[in-house]
Amino acid sequence: QIFIEDFKKLVDEGKKESVRSVIKFMANSIQSELFTKCMYNDRNYQGIGYMRAILNSFLLDLSFDFWQKCNIHLKVQNTPIISCVWNHSRMIDGLMGLGEINKNPFNGISFAYNIHAFLIEPLGLVVVDNGNHSVNAAIVYNEGEIIVNTVIDISEVLEKYRFDEKKYVNIETNKKVNIKNLKNNSESFTYTFGLLFEMARVLKNAKDENGYVYYDVN
C-alpha cells in the first residue's frame, strides 16, 4: 500500500520520466527472473500455461473485444518490456548473435514477422509472447525498437478487481477471483505483477481525471 501511495505521488507531481523509469525497472526485474530460471533450466510453473499466466496477470477475464490491432514502433531503451523466454539455448543464441556488440543490431522491423507484442494500457507495458529470445537480447543490450501489433486497455478489469497483495479479488464482494490461467486461479504470476496491476489503476485514475499519460505511442 505504501509503495502504491508513493507511486501515486510521482504521477500526481507529473514526474513522467520517473514513472516510466520505475515501471521499466520493475519490468526488467521480472525479465531478470525469467532469464535466470530459463538459464538454469529449472522453470517450474506447474498447472498453468506459462505465457498465458503472465498476460492474464494483467487481463484477468477481459474480453477479446478489448484487443485492438495496431502498428506501434517503440524504442526498447524507453519501453518497459517483458519477453517470455522459455528455452535457454535459444536465449544464449540470441545473446551471441544479436546486438551492436555482435555487429548485428536488433532491428524490430526485420523481426516483425516473428514478434507478437501486446501493449498493456494504461500501464504502457509491452508483453511479448512470440519472438521472445530475440526481444530478450534487445532488452539485455537495451537497444533497437520493437513493433507492437496489439494494444489492450485493461481499464474495465481495473473497475472490477483489485490486487490484495496476494491474490485478485472482486472489488464489490471482496471475494477472490476464480479465473483460468492465473496462478492457483486467483494469484498474480509473481508479486511484482500484482503491484504493476495496482500501478495501472493509479495511471487509469490520472488519465480519467486529467488525461495523464506518461508515454507517447505516436
Locate the predicted segments by residue.
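Accessory, usually C-terminal, subdomains that scaffold auxiliary metal cofactors
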Residues: I147-N210
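N-terminal accessory interaction module
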Residues: Y212-N218
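Short active-site loop/helix that positions an aromatic residue
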Residues: N132-I146
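Short His-Asn-centered micro-motif
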Residues: V127-N130
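Short alpha-helix boundary/capping and kink motifs at helix termini
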Residues: Q1-L125
